Amino acid sequence: MPDLPSAFLPLLLLSKFVTPVTFRHHRYDDLVRTLYKVHNQCPDITRLYNIGRSVKGRYLYVLEFSDYPGTHEPLEPEVKYVGNMHGNEVLGRELLLQLSEFLCEEFRNRNQRILRLIQDTRIHILPSMNPDGYEVAAAQGPNTSGYLVGRNNANGVDLNRNFPDLNTYFYYNSKYGGPNHHLPLPDNWKSQVEPETRAVIQWIRSLNFVLSANMHGGAVVANYPYDKSLEHRFRSPHRTSNSPTPDDELFQTLAKVYSYAHGWMHQGWNCGDYFPDGITNGASWYSLSKGMQDFNYLHTNCFEITLELSCNKFPRQEELQREWLGNREALIQFLEQVHQGIKGMVLDENYNNLTGAVISVTGINHDVTSGEHGDYFRLLLPGTYSVTAKASGYEPKTVTVTVGPAGPTLVDFQLKRSTTQVHPVQKAPGRGQGSRAKQPRTSRKKDQAAKRHRGPA
Amino acid sequence: MKFSSVSEEKPGLLAPPAQPLTKMFQGAWLCWASLLLLVRVTQPCPVGCDCFDRKIFCSDEQLAAIPLDIPSHVTDIVFVETSFTTVGTRAFSGSPNLTKVVFLNTRVHHLEPDAFGGLPRLEDLEVTGSPFSNLSANIFSNLSSLGKLTLDFNRLAALPEDLFHHMDTLESLQLQGNQLQTLPGRLFQSLRYLRTLNLAQNLLTQLPKGMFQSLSSLQILKLSDNMFARLPEGVLSNLGSLQELFLDSNAITELSPHLFSHLLSLEKLWLQHNAISLLPVSAFSSLRNLTFLNLKDNALRTLPAGLFTHNPGLLHLSLSYNQLETVPEGSFANLRKLASLTLSHNAITHLPENVFRNLEQLVKLSLDSNNLTVLHPTLFHNLSKLQLLDLSRNQLTMLPGGIFDTNYDLFNLALLGNPWQCDCRLSYLTSWLRLYNDRIFNTHTFCAGPAYLKGQLVPNLKQEQLVCPGNPGQLGLDDREPAGSWDLAVEGRAAHRQCIYGNPEGTVLLACEEAQCRWLNIQLSSREGSDVTAMAYNSSQEWELRSTCGSVRVTVSIEAQAAGP
């Protein structure tokens, strides 16, 4: 194995002694029944809610696992899994239903690893983002050769090409200065996206997600941002190139966590294609615009990867058990990665929470912000970092932090109100990163005002 | 003249009747077509519901009654979190084609006696997560086609004995998560074709002896999460088709010797999270098809000899979280297909040499969290397919040489949480780790001694650090050949003899050959901050080091140099 962080310590395989689950495909009504069954079986640690509806009116159900479901506990990170974004790519949907049953069953069996995970993490599982597309694919039957039937939503739109395109804006800012995180949405974004996309965007803006994976099929590889090529606009569209994020090493590690914990993804040779370590930069594979994983990174605090899980997009029912056994450890280990890096509270002199404070790490051109409870989460690999917290009206504070292999490292910031009476100077964007103008968000209201002034990106 | 008159009249009469008839026919046809179109176009979806072809989902929290205008072609209807509280008599009789009716977490707390009358084709009925607590005896009496009935997570406290008496076609009955304390003895008498019965998560403490005697087709029986302290002898005696039996998470303290004696088809048996302290030797002797056996988290202190003799097909066996102090030598002798064996979290102090000898297919072996101090060199021999071995959290100080020599596939070895003594006796293990195991798996495996290596990471050790004072570092034998011999071989060997000189505390070590010394290791103060003082600048210290080769004196001085380039 290549060098990997020590987070792999709990690599001892999960016991096979788990209550067996039913390995079958689930149409929409069966999906709903299964989710309700898990919720009813584990009512104290689950919450079943919907984030919106598909074009045809099917609900996008989310099952939440937490020791206090429905509540964000400060310093407890939010993670999400999204399946079935392409309606005909169904393994993710089935795996997430199995994962839901597994978490519930293992919690009831007092599995210490799962108990700890549920106590320390707030897990949101959206088994199907495209329930209409799924029904189209399922109606074809799993053995038909229709490659794309059911991929799109009921309006014929590919949902992984339907998010606001923030990459161009980021590439411009990297060159000429401008925000490196929480890029704003265009004013008219709601009219540009499908109902499913709108529901997901509103969902990921409503919770301070830290880590995420969305599940696809047709290959076996863990794909990490950026999906959109940096060079796409300036070179031939047929040439692709690696397009790293400022957190490239971290994303590679997250992808490797999944691929190496997976039964066979790490072997690289799958589906007639080869990916070293079973991972790939999205843009170096093929470039795509308006994808969900780039949107998560550029608009929110969330680090999302894309998991291609099976060669056959709609595997036969008989293959589901093997797929579950191959993915189960990876699904758990990936969730555990949300506890790497640093986290803490951002407070003022009177110990009030500061929302929207900006957390910067020297050398990483991507900041994160504190949430509504004043807590922040910054995924980082083991090492020593210089970390700065800034908030409008407060003096910035910088500390040096060492992140160990067993995380997370707790780093609280207490900021003093600024006594400087300097008026903000309106500068034109200058050259180089040093003159980047950061826009800390101290409240959603202020952010709205800023967006109105700025206009469409 | 008359003939001519008659002929003229007849053609005139024929013309008028033909024309009106044609016109009427055309009008009727148009009218019929219009009616057909109207009927199709005006099939509305009931308010508060969503229609998908022949399926209806009603998820409106404000839906106060079952819609009366369900289209007649609908086959499936699902209510999710609706607010009506009663299903009235024959509530769905206007929808005779329904095959599936589902209520999920609604507020239904009353089902009228004939609520589901008029549904001759109903196959799947579910009322789950509702607050109703009782059922009338004839509530399901008209459902002659029902194959699946699910009444999970309601508040049922008792069931009338005749409840299922006319349900000849039922294959799946789910009663999980209710508040059932007792069941009438003849409740399941009519369910000859039942395959799955789920009574998990209730409050059952006992079962009438004949409870399951009619269920000769039953394949899966779930009794998990109840309050059984015992099961009556013979209660399972007619379940010849049973494949999976769930008795986990109860309060079972003992199993009668013949409880499972008729379960000839059983493949999986879940007994974890009980309080079983003793197993009769015949407990599993009839289960010749058993592949999974889970005895985790019970109170077992010993395993009777021959317990698993008759389970040759067993693939997965868990005995973790018990109180075993050892395992009798022949316990697993007949488990030649076993792939996974878990003995973690017991009180095992020793294991017989041949206890795992026949487990040729074993892939995973968990021995973590026990009290093992010494392992026999051949303990894991024959386990040529072993991939994962967990020895963490025991009392091991060393492992004997050759212990993993036949474990060709072993790539995942867990060693953390043991008091490893990192001296010459650990040479085999560290060499093996360097060659065969990825060090990433043992990043928390530390030396407990000797003092100068305490806290060091085992996989990072160098071979020359693993020394035992007073013993030759390379050869295990004293060379007793007389000096001056003319034999070249003897002379060559003598020339390479290595001596390790050390002080009693082990803080100073010196490795020498006949004519020269190669390395010196000095620990100036103990990591534990003992009373031994470290050396100050501009001081010197002297040690007399001993080995079987003799003794040497070592003097070390530290001089502070004047600051300069």
Swiss-Prot record, chain A:
Biological-process GO terms, alphabetical: bradykinin catabolic process; peptide metabolic process; protein catabolic process; protein processing; response to glucocorticoid
Active site (record annotation): E308
Residues making up the signal peptide according to the UniProt record: 1-23
Name under which the protein is recorded: Carboxypeptidase N catalytic chain
Job of this protein: Protects the body from potent vasoactive and inflammatory peptides containing C-terminal Arg or Lys (such as kinins or anaphylatoxins) which are released into the circulation.
Protein family per UniProt: Belongs to the peptidase M14 family.
Glycosylation sites: T400, T402, T409
Gene Ontology MF annotations: carboxypeptidase activity; metallocarboxypeptidase activity; zinc ion binding
One Gene Ontology cellular component annotation held by this UniProt entry: extracellular space
Cofactor: how and how many bound: Binds 1 zinc ion per subunit.
Main location: secreted
Catalytic activity: Release of a C-terminal basic amino acid, preferentially lysine
Region annotation (Disordered) ranges: 418-457
Cofactor: Zn(2+)
Disulfide links within the chain: C42-C104, C271-C311
Lineage, highest ranks first: Eukaryota, Metazoa, Chordata, Craniata, Vertebrata
Span of domain Peptidase M14: 24-338
Gene3D superfamilies named among the record's database cross-references: Carboxypeptidase-like, regulatory domain, Zn peptidases
Subunit structure: Tetramer of two catalytic chains and two glycosylated inactive chains.
Segments forming a coiled coil: none
UniProt-annotated location(s): Secreted, Extracellular space
Tissue: Plasma. Expressed in liver.
Positions with a binding annotation for Zn(2+): H86, E89, H216
Enzyme Commission numbers on file: 3.4.17.3
Alphabetical UniProt keywords: Carboxypeptidase, Disulfide bond, Glycoprotein, Hydrolase, Metal-binding, Metalloprotease, Protease, Secreted, Signal, Zinc
